[in-house]
Structures are given as C-alpha cells and as structure tokens.
C-alpha cells in the first residue's frame, strides 16, 4: 500500500473528526452559558431555530461534497468557486483565525478545569497555566507533524472516550429531572435582565454557533477521504449526534436547577450541575471528561487550521510557503504559522487577565472565534444556493434541484440571521481581523503575477477596511471593547 493511500480517512474517522471538532469545551459550559442569556421557553425556541438552520447547513455541505467533489478545502473552496478569489481568501482567513482563537480559549478552559484540582492553575491564566499550556501546544504540534492519519486515529479514540461522561450526565439528570423546576418561569418574566423572548433567543445564538463550529470538519478534509461520498454522510451523522447531546444536556439541566441558579455557576457548569445531583464525584467525572474532550478538540482544530491554509495555498490564494508539506504529507509551514499565533495569544491572555470589563479570557475568545466563522458559513450556504439557481450539476435532476433550492435558501437566511444576532460590535471586530489578511492575499497574487483585486472585490475590500477603521477607533475611544 502506498503512503498516499494509507493516509486516506474512512467514514468512521471522518465522522469522529466532525463530532470531535464540535464537542469541545462548549457543551461542558452549556448550562451556564444558556441560562445567562435565556430561560426555558426562549431556549427551546432557540434550539428549534438552530436545529433547522444548522441541519440545512449540514445538508448544504453534504450536497456540495457530492456535487462538487473536485473542490478541496470545504468553506474556502466553495467561497472561491462561487464568488471569486478574494471571497475564497476571506473564508480561509476567517476560518483560520476562528480556529486558532478557539484553540487559545480551549487551552485556557483546560487549565481552568485543572485549577479545580490544582489551585496553581487558577482560571487558566496564571504563569503556571500559560507555561503548561505552551508545553502542551507544542506537544500536539509535533504529534500532528508525524502524520494526518495518525493524529486522526488518536482523535477517534478521544471522541469515544469523552462521549461516555456525557451519556452518564444525561442518564443521571433524566432521573433527577423535576417538571416543577423546569416550568417554574418558562419565559423568564421574574428576571427583567433577560429582556424579551426575542432578545433572549438572539442573545443565545452565538453560543449555539460556538458549540456547532466543526460541522464542516469532514468537508475540509475532503481531499483525504477514502470515498468522497463519505464526506456528506459524516457531516450529517456527526451533526445529528451532537445536536441530540447538546439539547439533552441543556434542557435536562434546566429541570435540575433553576435559571438563576444555573446562570450563577462557574464553568465548566456541567460539573457543578452533576455535583448538585450526586455530590463531589459528579464534578470530578465531568472535569475528567472535559479534559479528554478538550485534548481531542485541540487535536481536531490543529488539524483543521493547517489544512484550510494549505488548501488555499495550493491554488495560489495564500502565499506559496504555506503549501509545503513534510515527508508525512502534513502542511508543516501552515502548522507552524498557526501554532506561533496560538503561542503569542497565550501570552496575551496572561497580560490581559483581570481586565476591568469583567469578561474572562475564555469568553472573549469564544465570542471572537464565533464571529469570525459567520462569514465563511454564509459564503458556503450562498454557493449552495447559487448552484441551484443556475442549475449547475442539476441538468437532468429538476426534483433534486427544487429540494436543494429550498434547503440552501433556508441555510442562507439562517446565516444572515446569525450575522444579525451577533450584533454590530462583533461585525466591526471581525472586519478589524479580516483587513490585515489582505497582505497575504496581495503576496500570493504577486507570486503569480495577477492583479490583487478585480471588479467588485475592490468595493468589498474597501467596506472591510472602513469597518476595520471604525473598529480600531472604537477600541481607542472606548465605545467598543473586546
């Protein structure tokens, strides 16, 4: 068997990659995160919107994987094929930043969890925590350098291991669930700080996106799949599995403790919910599960970060140095660039801990990472819609075209809703992070002797720059904060 064929990923590994990417730290903090924004009624409405929106997005990724198998790189490739080089670059850049910002947040949460057992790690932002996080970062880095397939196998093992505590949590809370607690204040009327039901639903949206980031994981690795048809299957199977886990964890928690009680919990709040039911050993169980979960999620996202930059560099949308692979067919330069950025921001976390805004480093990274991935998701959904409108690949399949048109239309509407729900603040902060990427885009274009921007791309870039300038001034003046 050749080295290339031995690196191919089967359906099980691809599905584990999707599940492993989505089940990181988010689900373990879900009870408090949701209760801080919404009560039971709004939570149920929000999950219904999320289920429909994210399922249509999963179906779009499945359809694109089947109908456009020649496109490698997922969100990046779809944006480029549909809307040009700069949109493709922007999707790659935004996805990449989202991924490694999420990794920084995961490192902080991991050592914050260890702080439950070893106070020296505090909330994940002490000297000891940053030093140990750095050691772990580079250990994962060199593991991935040994080969994509080897790391994917380890991810499969950690995915299975971390799901067990989640099922135990669900089973125990199912028996501890009390209907009178669940229905005590369905619409949150006793807590005016939550606002209207519409505001509650809107405020919980970024959290739902955060816990679903990774749904596109299999499509990013489409070029390494043993069967291209497995990419779509892995996306949908992974989505349904994670959706069930998320909804059960969230809803059952609200039948064990009230919304005000959940909102006041420290994270990982799932550990404290189980401790409330069964005692100290419950918190230990969930904390161990979280540690395994975070290690698996970090491994998944280290892989995804490098792969998206590598895919963009292969066709000259990113500079040439990012497409170089080592002897194990790993995009080594992309991996080095990614983890250097993570290392820098781990140091930044230490120096920005205790900011007067009161927001912890993990939450800041969560919100920024989520806002950065909204644009790549939008362009992927829009490309699915574009194919159906043009009839491309549907020449003899009118019925499928009509079905996919509806699905892609819903996915686009959902993506636009997410941009609205995220709010102007995070749209401007995203522009501030998107704008500097044009330097790499210009370098890549210079390497192949092409003009940097063409046509409408100039207007889009101008809008990004204006948004970035407004954000920069806002941070300076104080009307915007991270």
UniProtKB/Swiss-Prot annotation:
Membrane topology: Multi-pass membrane protein
A Pfam cross-reference name: AA_permease_2
Main location: membrane
GO molecular function, one term: arginine:ornithine antiporter activity
Localisation per UniProt entry: Cell inner membrane
Signal peptide positions (record): none
Reactions this protein catalyses: L-ornithine(in) + L-arginine(out) = L-ornithine(out) + L-arginine(in)
Keywords attached to this entry: Amino-acid transport, Antiport, Cell inner membrane, Cell membrane, Membrane, Symport, Transmembrane, Transmembrane helix, Transport
GO biological process, one term: L-arginine transmembrane transport
Cytoplasmic compartment residues: 1-10, 62-100, 146-156, 224-235, 305-333, 387-403, 447-458
GO cellular component, one term: plasma membrane
Periplasmic membrane side: 32-40, 122-124, 178-202, 257-283, 355-365, 425, 480-482
Transmembrane regions listed in the UniProt entry: 11-31, 41-61, 101-121, 125-145, 157-177, 203-223, 236-256, 284-304, 334-354, 366-386, 404-424, 426-446, 459-479
Observed effect of gene inactivation: Mutant is unable to utilize extracellular arginine as an energy source under oxygen-limiting or anaerobic conditions.
UniProt record similarity statement: Belongs to the amino acid-polyamine-organocation (APC) superfamily. Basic amino acid/polyamine antiporter (APA) (TC 2.A.3.2) family.
Function recorded in the entry: Catalyzes electroneutral exchange between arginine and ornithine to allow high-efficiency energy conversion in the arginine deiminase pathway. Also mediates the proton motive force-driven uptake of arginine and ornithine, but the exchange is several orders of magnitude faster than the proton motive force-driven transport.
Stated name of the protein: Arginine/ornithine antiporter
Source organism (scientific name): Pseudomonas aeruginosa (strain ATCC 15692 / DSM 22644 / CIP 104116 / JCM 14847 / LMG 12228 / 1C / PRS 101 / PAO1)
